Swiss-Prot record:
The gene is smg. It comes from Klebsiella pneumoniae (strain 342). Belongs to the Smg family. This is Protein Smg.
Amino acid sequence: MFDVLMYLFETYIHNEAEMRVDQDKLTRDLTDAGFEREDIYNALMWLEKLADYQEGLVEPMQLASDPLSLRVYTEEECQRLDASCRGFLLFLEQIQVLNLETREMVIERVLALDTAEFELEDLKWVILMVLFNIPGCENAYQQMEELLFEVNEGMLH
């Protein structure tokens, strides 16, 4: 399912391709690209839930905004988000790429992924997808994109 999301984000969303794509045509295109129908369905449902945030149909969990408070992760969250992922989320909050609401959206979307393995690189892409879809997060998206691609470019040298 995560592979389908990555493909969709890179092919349609990130490249600003035509957003009004017929779902049946999209499913056919993804099937032709080699993805399984169940993964396609799950990815489209995942994106639909993300769109609910964008449209204001779902509100992120409201938490205390005391600057001295610290997010305590549940056991389920710790199983999916290892220490490096949790540390990266904290780092993004500290540099104000994420706020309390967007952090909770990211965590919720990560937990909704149907994947056995989840790494820091995967988290970075989920963060990009969330920020891209939330109105008013354009600057945060741009900062995250710069962070993601600066690090990856640095690895090539």
